[in-house]
Structure formats: structure tokens, C-alpha cells
């Protein structure tokens, strides 16, 4: 009787600008504190596409072939000798950032700021758009039975929204402005509502994206065309009847950041989530004299347990974010679809035996 064929580890690998390939990698062996995962669902992020198109994001440069993907969930296939809280068959969501050392940022609970952190699909670290992947077990979180694999993968972008709303201090009764109706804008909207925001207004250039934001839960939407930042701020105030206490800027566009400063209530907070140009011109004096606090966001920290609780309790519904699904074998087609700006969140299905959500 012929031996069963050994499974292959099909992986999506970027080699440099414009050079994206599907290749078979060796199946990794987990270390003592790691687990081997059979990947199930992995979302495509704008950073994945940027590494494909440009070969770099800022100082993070693709210098050797790198597996893409960091919005992920899967099933435990094998556990390391020291792993006690997980077992084969457990369904897990993966937090992609794992501290390499217990530095000052880890000690203060802000491990996302550690300069030596491992992060999936950030050069030189491989991601998890593949069939099999090993990860630190402490950063793999069991999914409740009522949370799907796709929801587990979406915890990564949801975590950005949680971290942004925490940084902004969103609480009961707040009016919140979200600039940008892409995936991060939409999760920021959902989290703001879950944290008690009374009204959330979302702005964007795209009418279809605003329609989706409205469908998902935005109280008000504003399509931007050729207005000045001051005019946009005036329209936001007109819609809400007052200036928002918190603005979450998810585009990184200079004009949108300017509008965010003008729009935010005196004494309020502007949270910068979107990454744009390194040098940006903003009306800083306008923020200073009105005590508008400007806070940055870099990824997230300490968000996965909260996100899982929100999903399990149905406090947020992120399922409508997924608009396209592709098997891993069609990853190149999926990336082209993303590049064309079609849909909201594209999900790649990595397990050939289970293509369900």
C-alpha cells in the first residue's frame, strides 16, 4: 500500500517589488514554547500589497524572500514540549507581534513599541499566508465555538480599532469622527459604538464604502469631494450639531489630518491611525491653542482577549467586512482584486479541506 502523500506547505512569498510567487516551503517544527498551526483564514492587508508593489514600507525593506500575511487564524496541529494551554485541534487566533526580549516597553505593557519585536510579514520576519506556520503559543488565543475562523482572522484589524479607541478615550455619550471608510475605519466605527459612543460620523471619498459603513452601523456619513479641510470640519459639526470629542484619522492623507484637527472639539483628541507621508503640513497652532491632543497609534497591544470577548458576546459584528474569498492557490488573483480597490476585506482560505468561514 502506497504511503500517504506528505502535505505541502504552499506559501505566498514576495521576492521584491512586483515579484509575488506561490512556493512550497518546508513545514516548520515548533520549538518548546511554540505551536504548529494548520492555517485556515488569512486576510489581505494594505501592508501586504505595499510590500508586493514597492518592496518596502519606510525602513522595513524586503531584502530576502518573505512570506506575507498577518491577519490570521488556524488550528493547532502540534504543540511544543512546554506548551500547556493549547492542544492539537484547538482553533486559535494569532496575534502577529511577539516580543523578543523583556525590554522597558514590555515591562510597561506597551510591547508593540519594542524595537526588536517579531512581527509577521514585516522584514525580515515571515508571515502566515501559507498552509502551515509555527508561532509563539502565548500569542495564540483559543476561539470560542461561536466565533468563526474568519472572525478570528479579523481580530487583527479589529485590534487596531480597539487600540485607537482606547488611545482616544472613547466612552459613553461621545461623538466620534472617523476619517476613512476602509477596513480600519469600519472597525474603529464598530468599536467606538461598542464603547458607548452616542454618534459616529464617517467620512470618505468613496460613496460605495460610505454606503457599507452606514450599513454596518455609522450614524452619519459624509462624502468628501473638493472641500477644504475647514469646510469638511464645518460639515461634520453641522451633521453632529457639535464638534466631536474624538477624531480617529484612518487615511494618512494630509488634508484629512488637517480636517481632523479643525473638526475636533477643544480639549478633545485626534488619534492618528493611517500612515501617510513622513513629513506632513498641519495647522499645529490650531491644535495647540485649543488643547486638541494628538496621539499616534502603532499596531496594538493587549487587545486579543478583549476582541474575542466582544465577538463571543456579539457586541460587534465584523462578518460583513468580508466581501471576497479566494483559495490560497488563487492568491495572486486575490492580490490583483485588492489592488483594483474592489470590496472591503479579502480573505484567503489556506486549508484545502475546509473553505468555510
Curated annotation (Swiss-Prot):
Binding site for NAD(+): 184, 204, 209, 273-275, 297-299
Documented EC number(s): 1.1.1.-, 1.1.1.14, 1.1.1.9
Alphabetical list of Gene3D superfamilies matching this protein: Medium-chain alcohol dehydrogenases, catalytic domain (3.90.180.10), NAD(P)-binding Rossmann-like Domain (3.40.50.720)
Segments traversing the membrane: none
One Pfam family it belongs to: ADH_zinc_N
Co-factor note (free text): Binds 1 zinc ion per subunit.
GO biological process: flagellated sperm motility; sorbitol catabolic process
Positions with a binding annotation for Zn(2+): 45, 70-71
GO cellular component: mitochondrial membrane; motile cilium
Keywords for the protein's UniProt record, in alphabetical order: Acetylation, Cell projection, Cilium, Flagellum, Membrane, Metal-binding, Mitochondrion, NAD, Oxidoreductase, Phosphoprotein, Zinc
Catalytic activity, reaction form: xylitol + NAD(+) = D-xylulose + NADH + H(+); L-iditol + NAD(+) = keto-L-sorbose + NADH + H(+); keto-D-fructose + NADH + H(+) = D-sorbitol + NAD(+)
Topology within the bilayer: Peripheral membrane protein
Keyword Plastid in annotation: no
Keyword Signal: no
Molecular function via GO: D-xylulose reductase activity; L-iditol 2-dehydrogenase (NAD+) activity; zinc ion binding
Domain of life: Eukaryota
Sequence positions bearing Phosphoserine: 211, 225
Cofactor names: Zn(2+)
SMART domains attached to this UniProt entry: PKS_ER
N-acetylalanine modified-residue sites: 2
Function: Polyol dehydrogenase that catalyzes the reversible NAD(+)-dependent oxidation of various sugar alcohols. Is active with xylitol, L-iditol and D-sorbitol (D-glucitol) as substrates, leading to the C2-oxidized products D-xylulose, L-sorbose and D-fructose, respectively. Is a key enzyme in the polyol pathway that interconverts glucose and fructose via sorbitol, which constitutes an important alternate route for glucose metabolism. May play a role in sperm motility by using sorbitol as an alternative energy source for sperm motility.
Family: Belongs to the zinc-containing alcohol dehydrogenase family.
Quaternary assembly: Homotetramer.
Protein name in the entry: Sorbitol dehydrogenase
Source organism of the structure: Macaca fascicularis
Amino acid at each position: 500500500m502506497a504511503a500517504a502523500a506528505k502535505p505541502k506547505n504552499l506559501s505566498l512569498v514576495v521576492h521584491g517589488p512586483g515579484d509575488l510567487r506561490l512556493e512550497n516551503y518546508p513545514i516548520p517544527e515548533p520549538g518548546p514554547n511554540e505551536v504548529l498551526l494548520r492555517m485556515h483564514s488569512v486576510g489581505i492587508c494594505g501592508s501586504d500589497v505595499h510590500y508586493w508593489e514597492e518592496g518596502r514600507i519606510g525602513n522595513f525593506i524586503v531584502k530576502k524572500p518573505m512570506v506575507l500575511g498577518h491577519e490570521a487564524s488556524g488550528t493547532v496541529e502540534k504543540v511544543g514540549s512546554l506548551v500547556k494551554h493549547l492542544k492539537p485541534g484547538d482553533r486559535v487566533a494569532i496575534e502577529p507581534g511577539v516580543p523578543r526580549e523583556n525590554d522597558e516597553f514590555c515591562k510597561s505593557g506597551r510591547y508593540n513599541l519594542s524595537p526588536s519585536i517579531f512581527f509577521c510579514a514585516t522584514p525580515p520576519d515571515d508571515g502566515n499566508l501559507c498552509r502551515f506556520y509555527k508561532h509563539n503559543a502565548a500569542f495564540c488565543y483559543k476561539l470560542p465555538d461561536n466565533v468563526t475562523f474568519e472572525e478570528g482572522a479579523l481580530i487583527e484589524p479589529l485590534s487596531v480599532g480597539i487600540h485607537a479607541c482606547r488611545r482616544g478615550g472613547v466612552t459613553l455619550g461621545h461623538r466620534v469622527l472617523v476619517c476613512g471608510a476602509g477596513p480600519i475605519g469600519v472597525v474603529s466605527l464598530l468599536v467606538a459604538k461598542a464603547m458607548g459612543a452616542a454618534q459616529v460620523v464617517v467620512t470618505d471619498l468613496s460613496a460605495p464604502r460610505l454606503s457599507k459603513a452606514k450599513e454596518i452601523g455609522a450614524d452619519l456619513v459624509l462624502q468628501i469631494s473638493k472641500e477644504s479641510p475647514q469646510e469638511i470640519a464645518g460639515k461634520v459639526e453641522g451633521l453632529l450639531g457639535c464638534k466631536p470629542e474624538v477624531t480617529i484619522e484612518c487615511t494618512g492623507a494630509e488634508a484629512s489630518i488637517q480636517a481632523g484637527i479643525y473638526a475636533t472639539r477643544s480639549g478633545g483628541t485626534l488619534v492618528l491611525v493611517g500612515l501617510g507621508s513622513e513629513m506632513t503640513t498641519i495647522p499645529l497652532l490650531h491644535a495647540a491653542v485649543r488643547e486638541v491632543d494628538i496621539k499616534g497609534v502603532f499596531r496594538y497591544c493587549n487587545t486579543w482577549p478583549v476582541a474575542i470577548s466582544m465577538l463571543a458576546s456579539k457586541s460587534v459584528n465584523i462578518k460583513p467586512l468580508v466581501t471576497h474569498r479566494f483559495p490560497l492557490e488563487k492568491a495572486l488573483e486575490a492580490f490583483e482584486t485588492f489592488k483594483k480597490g474592489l470590496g472591503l476585506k479579502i480573505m484567503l482560505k489556506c486549508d484545502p479541506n475546509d473553505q468555510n468561514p
